[in-house]
Every structure is written in C-alpha cells, then in structure tokens.
From Swiss-Prot:
HAMAP family registered for this protein in UniProt: YfiT_hydrol
EC id: 3.-.-.-
Organism: Geobacillus kaustophilus (strain HTA426)
Protein's recorded name: Putative metal-dependent hydrolase GK0616
Function recorded in the entry: Possible metal-dependent hydrolase.
Listed GO MF terms: hydrolase activity; zinc ion binding
Signal peptide stretch: none
Length: 178
C-alpha cells in the first residue's frame, strides 16, 4: 500500500461513504457550514509574503488554496442544486490547475473569495439541511466518470475537501512557525 504524503494530505485521502447515515450527513453539513470560519482562522494574520508561499514544494500558494476553495465550492453548490432539481444530470468537471493560474486566483487578495465563501456556504448548508434522505440518494453523473454519484457522497467529498485544504494551510503555519 502506498504511503500518503502527510504534507499534501494532512487529514488523509477521501474515503467515500458506502451508505447513507443521517448522523454523518449532519456532520458533513456542519463542516460545510463551518468552512468559511475555519478557513478565516487558518489564514488570520498572514501577510502577503506568507499568503504567496506554497503550502508544499510544487503546490499552490496559500492564496491560491483560498481561491480554489471558492471555485470548488461554487462548482459543488451547483452540482448539488442540479442533483436536487434534475434527474441524474451530467456535471462538468473544472480544470482546477488551470483555474489556479488565472488572474483572479494569482493576483486578487483573498478577501473577495472569503466573502464569497461566507455567503455561498450559508446557502449551501441551508439547501443541504432542507434535503430529505431521498434527496441525498439522488445522483449526479460526473462527466467522464464511470457511474453516478449520490448527493450524500458529493456532500461527504466536499466536507472533506474543505477540511483538507484548511489543514494544508494550518500545517504550513505550524511547519513555518507562523
């Protein structure tokens, strides 16, 4: 079994749930609701030089991680909405590494993305809290993937995703003594 790089995956890799568990779903919703606050704590007090430091060699800068979380959250929110309102929609992936190179991800301060996350995650959590178990069993079909993804798995994935990137920033701060 391959060893997981603890700098790249400080909380481990994503493990997809095999079945719907209401208690777990509530934990995932809480993580999604809490991401903006947790991320603000992780980046609090960092100066421009620190924000422009890659979290690992060859990795994104802290600022790019923040902007990536805004990009990924927008995509995930829309995937959730499509999954709830359409029958098995095909959802397009986004070229994360290319998006991380765009001017808004490389030049813009992080505050606009943090503000976007505040509003978006409040709406996303409200949507998730309104969903029934049947809604969580609805699916989306990621373009190019084999099979469908139930919305409870999508929710778990993005709960993990936010914690994963926040932990990358926190880990960098700890390693650098910031």
């Amino acid at each position: 079994m391959a060893t997981v790089d603890p700098i790249r995956y400080p909380i481990g890799t994503f493990q997809a749930p095999q079945q719907f568990e209401a208690g777990e779903v509530q934990e995932w919703i809480a993580a999604i609701r809490g991401l903006p606050s947790d991320l603000r704590t992780a980046v609090s007090g960092l100066n421009d030089e620190q924000l422009n430091t890659p979290y690992r060699e060859g990795g994104w800068t802290v600022a790019q991680v923040v902007h990536h979380l805004a990009d990924a959250s927008m995509n995930a929110f829309l995937r959730t909405k499509w999954g709830v309102t359409e029958d098995g929609p095909t959802v397009k992936p986004f070229a994360e590494s290319e998006w991380a190179k765009t001017a808004d991800a490389c030049l813009l301060p992080i505050e606009p993305s943090l503000l976007l996350l505040d509003g978006l995650h409040a709406r996303w959590a409200a949507l998730l809290e309104s969903m029934t178990e049947a809604d969580f069993h609805r699916t989306v079909r990621p373009e190019g993937a084999a099979g469908e993804m139930p919305l409870y798995v999508l929710t778990a994935l993005y709960a993990w995703h936010g914690k994963h990137h926040t932990a990358q920033v926190a880990s960098l701060r700890k390693r650098k003594g910031w």
